[in-house]
Amino acid sequence: MRAYFYDGLPGDQRLPHDSGKPVNVDDLLAIGVYYYHLPELESVDNLARDRGYKNRDEITVSPKTMGDVYESKVKMFFAEHLHEDEEIRYIRGGRGYFDVRSKDDDWVRVLLEKDDLLILPAGIYHRFTTDETNYVHAMRLFKEDPKWTALNRGPEVDNNGHRQEYVKTFLAEPAQ
């Protein structure tokens, strides 16, 4: 895993867009994002049990597996959105980028590779893309039945209860 501020320059979303400003694991924790490197599947199973993840599936994002819909899917994943549930991804192969919003609403890019696991809290704005190899194989873990409802960023979604709880927990300044 490597995390850094996104450079904001135009160009292919699958390129690194590395600003040269690193972000560490503690910075990610401060916005509710958990990172683990778990080379053994048993460790993933233990984490799933401890956090109450009852269901899982696997997805391979690549032109070979998705065919003609690959480009449109990658564009859809890259639209800024949130979920009303935690998003848990364990990378089984390939590489991908999760971009998450910092406390200052800047993009933080997190490069994930094989054996990396990332947990995004409900309500955090984020987006995803493969890297320039156009291949990632990931396990998705869920607390309940698998669902993937993306709510794209906008004024209505800013007022969503899960978003408001996230803001209160991770972004609001402490009362003086």
Curated annotation (Swiss-Prot):
Enzyme class label: oxidoreductase
Positions with a binding annotation for Fe(2+): H81, H83, E87, H126
Keyword terms: Amino-acid biosynthesis, Cytoplasm, Dioxygenase, Iron, Metal-binding, Methionine biosynthesis, Nickel, Nucleus, Oxidoreductase
Pfam families for this protein: ARD
GO molecular function: acireductone dioxygenase (Ni2+-requiring) activity; acireductone dioxygenase [iron(II)-requiring] activity; iron ion binding; nickel cation binding
Family matches, as InterPro entries: ARD (IPR004313), ARD_euk (IPR027496), RmlC-like_jellyroll (IPR014710), RmlC_Cupin_sf (IPR011051)
Pathway annotation from the record: Amino-acid biosynthesis; L-methionine biosynthesis via salvage pathway; L-methionine from S-methyl-5-thio-alpha-D-ribose 1-phosphate: step 5/6
Superkingdom of this protein's organism: Eukaryota
Residues reported in the UniProt entry to bind Ni(2+): H81, H83, E87, H126
Bilayer-spanning residue ranges: none
UniProt GO cellular component terms: cytoplasm; nucleus
Cofactor(s) demanded: Fe(2+); Ni(2+)
Cofactor remark: Binds either 1 Fe or Ni cation per monomer. Iron-binding promotes an acireductone dioxygenase reaction producing 2-keto-4-methylthiobutyrate, while nickel-binding promotes an acireductone dioxygenase reaction producing 3-(methylsulfanyl)propanoate.
Family per similarity comment: Belongs to the acireductone dioxygenase (ARD) family.
Function: Catalyzes 2 different reactions between oxygen and the acireductone 1,2-dihydroxy-3-keto-5-methylthiopentene (DHK-MTPene) depending upon the metal bound in the active site. Fe-containing acireductone dioxygenase (Fe-ARD) produces formate and 2-keto-4-methylthiobutyrate (KMTB), the alpha-ketoacid precursor of methionine in the methionine recycle pathway. Ni-containing acireductone dioxygenase (Ni-ARD) produces methylthiopropionate, carbon monoxide and formate, and does not lie on the methionine recycle pathway.
Name of the protein this chain belongs to: Acireductone dioxygenase
Native source organism of the sequence: Fusarium vanettenii (strain ATCC MYA-4622 / CBS 123669 / FGSC 9596 / NRRL 45880 / 77-13-4) (Fusarium solani subsp. pisi)
